[in-house]
A protein has these predicted regions:
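Solvent-exposed soluble domains appended to multi-pass membrane proteins
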Residues: 1-332
């Protein structure tokens, strides 16, 4: 996208030091990355880190320093405040270039046992055998997210610039296993079929635009294809790799660590013999070429003409060595 003139912004309202986020977003090519430290400032960040398990204390700090901001829901930055910050950056963008933002929210993150005065539970699971407090808290948090997302869509509905928004969940919440067992119709999660085990980790995604796009309902699609689908929907020039993934998704719409599903809905475990072995082997080699075989990477496949990828950093080389070592241990 940078080769096509886009400026890029990343927002994750949590600590930047975790998982080396600053280095990661820089290596991914983002022009700017905003984390919790940038929102709070250094002194308040230290206070937050020291009292992270006490949402009422944190709310008091926010009330003193950011009165009326609605910054927190429980102990995390709310989706409403997050979206306001996203809109603020959009409004202050370089208007001479197209704009791309990648935003990982924090509002609904676990755990789900701590009470907070700034959170009101409003949604409850029905038709279940007992009360599940964690599930109810998470369901109520989703309602807050729905309201915040509605506000974001309403804002960009009134923006003249053509805009595409993709919203997706990165993982399922850590709630009561009994609740999950009930809604999946099994006595114990250890009794799940491979297909049920895979469906347990499904999350929804939604693509919206403030102009007419082709409406469609996609039954299943694994996350390795999602970025290519968004680029295609937005009319952005695709790399050969993006095109390859979109074609692969028509054959195997789901590929994940549990197995894969073909276009007819047939499920395969990785240990199964299937008619797709050669296709998957080819995919693995292409992935390896892109991620690890940097000296021989096919630039015409993975990048738009005119873009030069960043050189490998020392940390990347160390990470590759560690991965190889881990694989040797696993194979031993």
């Amino acid at each position: 996208m940078k080769a096509q003139g886009y400026s890029s912004f990343a927002l994750h309202p949590y600590y930047k030091a975790g998982w080396k986020r600053t280095e990661v977003y820089e290596n991914l090519g983002f022009d700017k990355f905003i984390g919790l430290e940038d929102i709070l400032g250094p002194e308040l960040t230290d206070e937050f880190q020291a009292n992270g398990s006490d949402p009422d204390y944190l709310q008091g700090l926010v009330d003193q320093n950011f009165p009326g901001s609605g910054m927190l829901l429980r102990q995390y930055v709310s989706d409403k405040y997050n979206n306001d910050r996203l809109i603020e950056d959009y409004e202050n963008r370089d208007k001479s270039t197209p704009y791309f933002a990648f935003n990982v929210t924090m509002q609904n993150h676990g755990g789900y046992t701590i009470s907070a005065q700034n959170f009101e539970e409003s949604i409850y699971a029905t038709n279940v055998s007992k009360t599940y407090p964690k599930a109810n808290k998470y369901l109520s948090l989703i309602k807050y997210t729905d309201d915040a997302f509605k506000g974001l869509v309403e804002y960009f509905s009134n923006v003249e610039e053509p805009t595409v928004i993709c919203m997706f969940g990165d993982h399922q919440p850590s709630i009561e296993t009994g609740f999950i067992s009930e809604i999946m119709g099994v006595d114990n999660l250890s009794n799940l079929t491979p297909e049920q085990e895979q469906s347990r980790y499904c999350t929804p995604f939604y693509i919206w635009a403030n102009y007419d796009i082709e409406e469609q309902e996609i039954e299943r699609l694994s996350s390795n294809y999602l970025s290519s689908l968004v680029l295609k929907t937005a009319g952005i020039k695709l790399t050969e790799y993006n095109k390859y993934l979109l074609n692969l998704s028509k054959i195997l719409p789901v590929i994940d660590n549990a197995g894969y599903i073909d276009a007819e809905g047939n499920y395969y475990k990785w240990s199964d013999n299937s008619p797709y072995t050669d296709i998957l082997d080819e995919y693995e080699k292409i992935q390896y070429n892109n991620i690890f075989d940097r000296e021989n990477v096919d630039l015409d496949t993975f990048y738009i003409e005119g873009y030069t990828p960043p050189e490998d950093t020392e940390e990347t080389e160390v990470a590759e060595e560690k991965t190889e070592t881990d694989e040797e241990v696993g194979n031993g």
